[in-house]
From Swiss-Prot:
PANTHER family found in the cross-reference section: KINASE HI_0665-RELATED (PTHR37419:SF6), SERINE/THREONINE-PROTEIN KINASE TOXIN HIPA (PTHR37419)
Protein name: Putative kinase HI_0665
Active-site residues annotated for this sequence: D209
Domain of life: Bacteria
E.C. number: 2.-.-.-
A molecular-function term among this protein's GO annotations: protein serine/threonine kinase activity
Enzyme class: transferase
Family: Belongs to the HipA Ser/Thr kinase family.
InterPro entries documented for this protein: HipA-like_C (IPR012893), HipA_Ser/Thr_kinase (IPR052028)
Keywords: Kinase, Transferase
Organism: Haemophilus influenzae (strain ATCC 51907 / DSM 11121 / KW20 / Rd)
Pfam families on file: HipA_C
Higher taxonomy: Bacteria, Pseudomonadati, Pseudomonadota, Gammaproteobacteria, Pasteurellales
GO cellular component: cytosol
Length: 343
């Protein structure tokens, strides 16, 4: 069965050749007749477009381009683009397909996710290489720029992994981040729940690179600061040089900062984060323990079929899908471990 390269839903017979559904094209571009093929080749992107590229990746530099819609197709611009184009870096093949699938999952799970999809370079007939394209979230309804501030800047922390001392230890945890966000935006149950679920899904899906710059504040005109939508959310499970280096980009709990102490899960037979640690995290950011145990964690466990289905329908290569789902299933089982005895 063929699936839409935007929505990952089954295509109708008359849509199979293009690879896009009318619904998907309208979702991404407000035009169901839009031509999603890029007007330049991968080689042109590498050799001609570098002066327009900007950005960073899960490790170092990931070329990006700003895009606009022109004559029912995408075109590149130096600035003021409405979309960002992100091909897979050579050192991380199929990262575009990975980000698309993972962001689609986050969208289907109820997170705020900008419109996104996969597009192909021009002139590729036998083997299409996809690039990830996403709507810019720092634009208002009139496409005017809104001020965006990444969390390392907002917190005045110079290192995105929280290594601010001479000892190379991490002194910024997800708990500290969550409290800072809640202090400077809306501190209510829905926001607490959103942050709680965001961090848990980073763990479950193998997003071991969710650092400070992957959280941002948006400052709408004449309004309070808001937490930016999900962005740069990928699974690094298929890339062992990153995945095997750490369980999460930052410590989960404030008491782990500076390597002062270990979360409970590391003192059990499992030797990594378990459900008890996420219960502690949730309580520390203001959630009720009973709500976490009786509602939030069971809801996440019940979302298993949806997660597996979307990855299975994605354009990631099968070995990458298998790798991500192996991590997901293992960590989902660990999340279900509560009141686990310590060694």
């Amino acid at each position: 069965m063929n699936f839409c390269r935007i929505l990952l839903k089954p295509l109708k017979k008359n849509e199979a050749l293009s690879g896009y559904s009318a619904e998907g094209l309208h979702y991404l571009t407000d035009n169901k007749h839009f031509n999603p093929e890029l007007p330049f080749s991968r080689q042109e992107f590498i050799t001609v477009k570098p002066q327009k590229q900007q950005g960073m990746s899960i490790s170092g530099f990931q070329p990006k381009l700003q895009l606009i819609i022109k004559d029912e197709h995408f075109d590149s611009v130096n600035q003021q683009g409405n979309y960002i184009l992100k091909p897979s870096p050579e050192e991380y093949p199929f990262l575009a397909e990975n980000e698309h699938a993972t962001m689609r999952i986050m969208k289907e799970l109820g997170f705020d996710v900008p419109e996104n999809g996969l597009v192909s370079f021009a002139g590729e007939q036998n083997h299409k290489e996809f690039a990830f394209v996403i709507t810019r979230f720092d634009r208002d309804k009139q496409q005017k720029p809104m001020h965006q501030e990444q969390l390392d800047g907002a917190m005045n922390i110079r290192d995105k992994y929280g290594k601010i001392g001479a000892d190379n230890e991490q002194y910024v945890s997800y708990e500290q981040i969550a409290k800072f966000i809640l202090q400077h935006t809306e501190n209510h149950l829905a926001q607490q729940r959103e942050i709680f679920r965001r961090i848990i899904y980073a763990y479950l899906l193998g997003n071991n690179d969710l650092h400070l710059r992957n959280f941002s504040f948006i400052y709408p005109k004449n309004s309070h600061p808001k937490l930016a939508p999900i962005y740069d959310f990928v699974s690094v499970s298929p890339y062992p040089e990153i995945f095997n280096s750490t369980l999460l980009a930052l410590p989960l709990l404030a008491r782990e900062e500076g390597n002062a102490t270990l979360a409970k899960g590391f003192n059990t037979q499992y030797g990594e984060y378990i459900g008890d640690d996420f219960v502690e995290f949730g309580e520390n950011i203001g959630l009720n323990k009973n709500v976490i145990i009786q509602k939030l964690i069971p809801e996440i466990i019940q979302e298993k079929e949806k997660v597996e289905q979307i990855y299975s329908q994605s354009f990631m290569p099968q070995p990458h899908i298998d790798c991500v789902l192996k991590t997901y299933r293992k960590r989902l089982a660990l999340l279900n471990l509560l009141n686990e005895p310590e060694l």
